[in-house]
Amino acid sequence: MHTTITRPARTLALFCALLLAGNVLSTGTARAKSTKGHDHAHNHAHGAKSDVYNGYFKDDQVKPRTLEDWEGEWQSVYPYLVDGTLDPVMADKAKHGDKSAGEYRAYYDAGYKTDVDRIVIAGASVTFFRGQRSAKANYVTDGYEILTYAKGNRGVRFIFRKTDGDDAAPQFIQFSDHNIAPEIADHYHLYWGTDRAALLKEVTNWPTYYPSDLTGKQIVKEMLAH
């Protein structure tokens, strides 16, 4: 059976086809713009986080933090530097930096050096382990300080003061983990002692801690990722 399409019908069919094509093109363009906008937003957010990590931020970006951000069991990375586990990290720094692997190793030896090999943080309590010996105390927030370093970038120390506990536990502890607002830490540098102001001047020794459930090789992978 042969069907004849009249001129008005042909005109209507052509109009519908053009309308459908326009809608498809418009949707495709909108999706392209949306994807491009998402990529731009993602890159901008990543860039902003990278700036903060490298020490470039505005004062009003800094927000108070609680011990909850560092809760958990942590291990010192110093033994891994001593036994050579971190040698690939030093080699990578030498490849991209201005010192030899040996020079970087000496720099990090001074920075990581500590006899506190493990720290456990739970609620307000912090326990410091030196081998089989431990010292435990409760801490409350004592604000934060923004520091400017020699090369022009900055860092934030989040400070906590002891309220009670063992005499061997430090009076003040200061966290630095490249974050400047509430965020769960994946590692941190810790400063401790009896003099709040004096600790702020300490920039050569910064014992560094990673989660206790990570192996040395996993810590190397984490460090190389940064």
Model-inferred region functions:
Residues 10:
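Polyanion-binding surfaces on beta-sheet-dominated domains and ring/shell assemblies
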Residues 2-6, 15-16, 22-100, 176, ...:
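Amphipathic/hydrophobic helical signal segments and adjacent flexible N-terminal regions
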Residues 105-173:
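Contiguous, well-ordered beta-strand patches that form the walls/edges
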